[in-house]
A protein has these predicted regions:
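Short regulatory helix/loop adjacent to the ATP-binding pocket of P-loop NTPases
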Residues: 91-105
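Conserved C-terminal helix/linker of AAA+ ATPases
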Residues: 165-183
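Walker A/P-loop nucleotide-binding motif
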Residues: 8-25
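Conserved AAA+ ATPase "SRH/arginine-finger" region at the nucleotide-binding site
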Residues: 107-119
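Pre-Walker A adenine-sensing motif
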Residues: 1-5
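C-terminal helical "lid" of AAA+/P-loop NTPase domains
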Residues: 141-145, 152-166
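Post-Walker A helix-loop "phosphate-sensing" segment adjacent to the P-loop in P-loop NTPases
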Residues: 31-42, 51-52
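Conserved nucleotide-sensing/catalytic segment adjacent to the nucleotide-binding pocket
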Residues: 49-87
Length: 186
């Protein structure tokens, strides 16, 4: 869809709890569509009258009143060909002007759920493989119980573990992970 520049809907609204991956998806989409004028931004960074053919707005519930009015007018003026937004609540519950919330609800709406521990473990193992090392279940389980649990923090911890493993010349094990976490907290 994005690679061809054709969108079946004018609006896609993604919502879910913090850490579910909304920002990751929006940034990846904006990067994929950058040649067509897309750029990632948060609602706090939204500049009224700054028109782009593809708008990608994160944390839409933080859009100021002036931005809400401008985005509503952009809808009516067909000032963009595609709008991708993310929020922590569904369109009917988002704290925005009712007319804007109604417009946002006219397209596709997807709810993202946070990954389960098993899915996080699988994602960490896949990330480790890409980085060139294996991650056994014991290491993944320890990481899930002793580090911040959002995927961004877990990936950062895994990357730090990889660097620590290379610096010390040791393979990735639970004792190495403990040492790496202790060092990062010191």
């Amino acid at each position: 869809m994005a690679a061809r520049g054709r969108f079946p809907e004018r609006v896609v609204y993604i919502w879910g709890e913090s850490g579910a991956g909304k920002t990751h998806l929006l940034k990846a989409f904006a990067e994929l569509c950058a040649a067509r004028g897309a750029a990632y931004g948060t609602a706090a960074e939204y500049e009224p009258q700054a028109r782009r053919p593809i708008l990608v707005l994160d944390d839409i519930e933080g859009l100021a009143e002036e931005g809400q009015a401008d985005l509503f007018n952009a809808f009516n003026d067909h000032a963009f060909t595609f709008l991708l937004v993310a929020a922590t609540s569904a369109p009917r519950d988002v704290p925005l002007r009712r007319d804007l919330a109604t417009r946002l609800a006219t397209g596709l709406t997807y709810r993202l759920h946070a990954l389960t521990d098993a899915e996080k473990g699988a994602a960490l193992a896949a990330h480790a493989r890409v980085r060139g090392f294996g991650l056994n279940d014991d290491v993944a389980s320890y990481l899930l119980t002793h580090a911040r649990r959002d995927m961004g923090s877990l990936i950062a911890a895994l990357d730090a573990l990889d660097r620590y493993s290379l610096e010390t010349g040791r393979i990735v094990t639970v004792p190495l992970l403990k040492a790496a976490l202790d060092e990062s907290r010191a």
